[in-house]
């Protein structure tokens, strides 16, 4: 494909934009927390407030896409899979952008996120696992150095849904944190038993907002710096340290941590619980952080095929 390509990822916690020119150079990358998945696990529908704030961001993105005359590809993930009114929401997205959103299956989401996360990292011998912590689901995906997906599991919790289900106090009580970590850990244990192909990897890569934020807090970044975060080794000890700090602070104090965007402060402890539980149960000493993600996978597939993520 020799045209500028744009992708909008309508996630359960954030709505994101990537625009890439005909030579593959990144022109625009934006992230906005819209919490589309807020309450969906309880109600089974996307709330009107969540729809309105997400559409407001998408309308702004549509203007950016139009200014670059880009081919636009829009995807929806876990919250949209869960909700009974997704068709109504997608109709509004199409009206705002002129493009039909595509509802990704869990397998497609995992595949595109894996390719997006790994493509810009140095090659390694052996398989790579990608941990993708979203707003309403978490994927563990293993692929080969040749880019073949070996196996993937999607677990039915993310930072929004885990926070809503388990972390009710400010700061969360020890019992709440323990329950959240146990729930995630049990799911990881079951996945490891049922999917032995998830083991024996050479590298583990962490992707999406929570993991990038945990890394940014560990570095104490006052401004987002992809050059310091992308490819960074985040150790288990560092992840545990960030978890202990953020989980014991009230929200009003937590927001002052360098590296933590205010809009993520309410759910970041849930993200810490998920990452720490995964690293504990899989015995991971460290992971490699990737600031590239599902968006990059969608754009790459679109540039290769012109079919919006269907290589």
Identify the function of each model-found stretch.
Residues 9-14, 131-137, 158, 207-211:
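A short acidic Gly-Thr/Ser loop motif
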């Amino acid at each position: 494909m020799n045209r500028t390509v744009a992708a909008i990822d309508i996630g359960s916690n954030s709505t994101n934009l990537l625009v890439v020119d005909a030579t593959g150079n990144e022109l625009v990358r934006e992230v906005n927390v819209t919490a589309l998945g807020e309450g969906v696990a309880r109600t089974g529908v996307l709330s009107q407030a969540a729809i309105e704030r997400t559409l407001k961001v998408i309308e702004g993105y549509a203007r950016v896409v139009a200014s670059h005359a880009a081919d636009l590809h829009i995807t929806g993930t876990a919250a949209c899979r869960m909700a009974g009114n997704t068709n109504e929401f997608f109709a509004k997205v199409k009206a705002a952008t002129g493009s039909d959103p595509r509802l990704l299956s869990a397998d497609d989401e995992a595949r595109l996120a894996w390719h997006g996360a790994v493509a810009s990292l140095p090659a390694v011998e052996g398989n790579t696992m990608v941990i993708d912590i979203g707003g309403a689901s978490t994927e563990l995906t293993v692929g080969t150095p040749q880019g073949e997906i070996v196996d993937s599991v999607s677990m039915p919790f993310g930072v929004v849904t885990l926070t809503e289900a388990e972390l009710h106090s400010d700061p969360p009580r020890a019992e709440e944190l323990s329950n959240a970590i146990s729930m995630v850990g049990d799911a990881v244990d079951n996945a490891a038993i049922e999917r032995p192909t998830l083991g024996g990897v050479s590298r583990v890569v962490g992707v999406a907002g929570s993991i990038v934020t945990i890394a940014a807090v560990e570095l104490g970044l006052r401004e987002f710096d992809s050059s310091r975060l992308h490819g960074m080794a985040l150790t288990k000890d560092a992840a545990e340290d960030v978890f202990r700090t953020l989980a014991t602070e009230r929200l009003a104090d937590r927001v002052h941590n360098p590296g933590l965007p205010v809009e993520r402060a309410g759910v970041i402890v849930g993200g810490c619980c998920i990452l720490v539980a995964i690293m504990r149960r899989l015995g991971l000493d460290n992971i490699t952080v990737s600031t590239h993600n599902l968006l990059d996978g969608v754009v790459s597939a679109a540039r290769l095929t012109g079919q919006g993520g269907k290589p």
